[in-house]
Design a protein with these regions (language model features):
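Short, ordered, surface-exposed loop/turn motifs in non-cytosolic proteins
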Residues: 490-500, 571-585
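Short, acidic Ser/Thr/Gly-rich low-complexity loop/linker segments typical of extracellular
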Residues: 501-509, 586-597
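Conserved structural position at the C-terminal beta-strand
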Residues: 144, 611-613
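Feature captures outer-membrane beta-barrel proteins of Gram-negative bacteria and organelles
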Residues: 9-20, 40-54, 188-202, 208-212, ...
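Extracellular beta-sheet/turn segments enriched in Thr/Pro/Gly and aliphatic residues
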Residues: 160-166, 476, 539-559, 624-643
Length: 643
């Protein structure tokens, strides 16, 4: 029996500085593996600003080119391009969901162009990752590392949809820089990238582009057609000449189709790349040639199909197919099927199937899974809770059964999960897993425990943000995109509505993340959570941030007691309806209602009220007050008389 203790650590750092219109951003990942070796990988650093008159962005530093026409290329240099965030929300492109099946608590890493762009931990069973910050046009390489060290790898194609934009619309991308390789042995060199897309009318879109360096050239031309209900089709041809490899030249033809059939709620995405000659190469192919050697497989055809079918109340079907043929290698194919629905309105049922086949290595993976989830939190009065059963047909033809209990608590701040898995063949793979995460105003804490016959794992982590601003330092949850700095004039412990765990700190600040750029965002404070000694004129603030901006959401608050006062004049007659009441040396005011009653907030324990019901001195008075009679809901009730 072999026993060992191993530790691994992971930290993702994403510092940023906003100075006027400029956004300075950096991303890096530090890892220390089980072997004790540590590594820091700098993903990118750049400065960027919006140019509103051009609906564009100017970027200086490290990033990747656009990918509507050519494959995305990592670079270090300068880029001026149309900003997608300035395009109406419904016309934006979204990243495909990465789906897979983990056999245990596993680490999932997603790479693009060799760089890790996303890393997370998933529980055993099917997973779906939809918030990956990928660059369109480059495949995503997914690595799933199980708790026993076994690794499964697969690729998720990320093909740009059919190119078709509205009449008169213009999109462009101009980049000058140096190729930024992941591998140190790759070729290095300056290059330029230029693409332009123009909508001639509602039917026809034209586009062209060039990628060039001292030893490489590629040119493309194509047209996109918008057939409305019949969908959008784009057809283009690309020519390349590789001076790094004896001036080999080649060409490729690409057809892309995208359509949404609104009558049937069916979405089609089809892309086919036909490489007319073996010598065609992308810019990355030419620059990475030294890394390929004997495994330099040349693609002949690459076809991907995705169909999403909504059945309204009867569920959602998602089908993906991909087949790649090579000039000098046998075929590869990948298929994924997923269907989910609700039974009896609240019981969730999901069935999935993933298949990968590489005929060259005779390597085949075939995984089937099914699960059913039953909510019962209301039965035991414990927030939301679900009991879930899942069965998986593993790659080794064994059957894994698992039962899990998961749910949310503390106003959706706490997420928890307990899972027990049993394998039909290998009882050493039976596992018990526990995991939880807790959202706070300063971030999200998570913890996990995983035990099997051979392995015991436990770990924890925290992610969040630290914001330095003109009034101090504020901790918050992880910032994604634009964010708002909540400012409540020093009022603490105020909850932001529909943002679990976001509460103002001792200085009255909080961070709200995930705001939409270039559109109105309404941020509400939760009225029921405001303390009895705090008053807020308006519990809503509306902001329209630019991309990656940090905007201030200001709320006018007053500290002090609240009271319903009955005011009498010198003759013990109730003060007239509509009279104005103010507090000496404070901004608190009120209007007298029926029977001389007025609601006031922001009051000290004692003070002087000024009451005015006319212009002359006989139509106003002062009333000293002391708050003594506190009623329910934190309200005081007093009867006061003019002096």
């Amino acid at each position: 029996y072999y026993s060992s203790n191993n530790e691994s650590y992971y930290a993702s750092l994403n510092p940023g500085v906003n100075i006027g219109s400029w956004r300075l951003r950096n991303s890096g990942i530090w890892m220390k593996g089980y072997d004790g070796e540590s590594e820091y990988q700098n993903s990118y650093i750049y400065a960027e600003r919006d140019i509103r008159s051009l609906k564009s962005k100017l970027l200086l530093g490290e990033s990747s080119t656009g990918s509507e026409i050519f494959d995305s290329v990592p670079f270090k240099g300068v880029r001026l391009s149309t900003s997608d965030n300035m395009i109406p929300y419904l016309e934006r492109t979204f990243v495909p969901t990465v789906r897979g099946v983990a056999n245990s608590v596993a680490q999932v890493d997603v790479r693009q162009n060799g760089y890790i762009i996303y890393s997370t931990e998933v529980p055993a069973g099917p997973f779906a990752l939809s918030d990956i910050p990928a660059a369109e046009g480059s495949d995503m390489e997914v690595t799933v590392t199980e708790d026993n060290g076994s690794v499964q790898r697969f690729t998720v194609p990320y093909n740009a949809p059919a190119i078709s934009i509205k009449s008169g619309s213009l999109k462009y991308d101009v980049t000058f820089g140096k190729y930024r390789p992941y591998y140190n042995v790759s070729r290095k060199g300056n290059f330029s990238h230029f693409t332009i897309i123009y909508g001639f009318n509602d039917l026809l879109t034209g586009y062209t582009g060039v990628q060039a360096s001292n030893n490489y050239f590629s040119g493309a031309i194509g047209f996109g057609f918008n057939f409305n209900e019949l969908g959008a089709v784009s057809l283009d041809g690309i020519y390349s000449k590789d001076g790094y490899n004896n001036d080999e030249d080649g060409s490729a033809v690409r057809v892309r189709y995208k359509n949404l059939l609104s009558e049937t709620n069916t979405t089609f995405d089809i892309a086919s790349y036909q490489y007319a000659s073996k010598n065609y190469s992308t810019f990355a192919d030419a620059m990475e040639k030294s890394m390929r050697h004997s495994y330099d497989w040349k693609k002949k055809n690459d076809t991907s199909i995705r169909i999403r079918q909504s059945f309204s109340d009867y569920g959602l079907l998602d089908l993906s197919l991909n087949k790649t043929t090579y000039w000098n290698k046998k075929d590869e194919s990948y298929a994924a099927f997923n269907y989910s629905t609700l039974l009896l309105r609240n019981i969730s049922f999901t069935v999935g199937w993933n298949k990968y086949f590489d005929s060259y290595y005779s390597d085949q993976e075939d995984v089937f899974s099914a699960s059913i989830s039953v909510p019962f939190g209301k039965m035991i009065n414990s927030g939301s809770a679900n009991l879930r059963y899942q069965i998986i047909n593993e790659r080794d033809d064994s059957i894994s059964n698992s039962v899990s209990l998961n749910g949310m608590a503390y106003n959706n701040r706490l997420a928890w999960n307990v899972t027990q898995s049993v394998n039909s063949k290998e009882h050493n793979n039976n596992r018990t897993s526990l995991s939880s995460s807790l959202k706070n105003s300063f971030g999200t804490m998570n913890a996990m425990y995983n035990h099997s016959h051979m392995v015991t794992q436990y770990g924890g982590g925290i992610n969040g943000s630290i914001v330095l601003h003109d009034k101090g330092i504020t901790f918050g949850q992880r910032i994604t995109g634009a964010a708002a700095l909540i400012d409540t004039d020093g009022s603490e412990n105020i909850t932001v509505l529909n943002k679990p765990g976001v509460i103002t700190d001792s200085n009255g600040f909080a961070i709200v993340t995930g705001l939409g750029s270039y559109r109105k965002n309404d941020i509400y404070l939760e009225q029921s959570k405001i303390s009895s000694d705090t008053s807020i004129d308006k519990t809503i603030s509306s902001v329209v941030p630019t991309d990656s901006a940090l905007v201030r959401a200001k709320y006018s608050t007053m500290k002090g007691s609240k009271a319903i006062l009955k005011l009498l004049d010198r003759n013990n007659v109730p003060i007239a309806f509509g009279s104005v009441v103010s507090v000496q040396d404070k901004s608190s005011t009120g209007i007298v209602g029926d029977d001389g009653r007025v609601y006031m907030s922001g009051l000290d324990g004692s003070g002087i009220l000024k009451v005015q019901w006319g212009k002359n001195s006989q139509e106003q008075c002062q009333i000293p007050y002391t708050l003594k009679n506190k009623k329910s809901l934190g309200l005081y009730s007093e009867t006061l008389k003019c002096m």
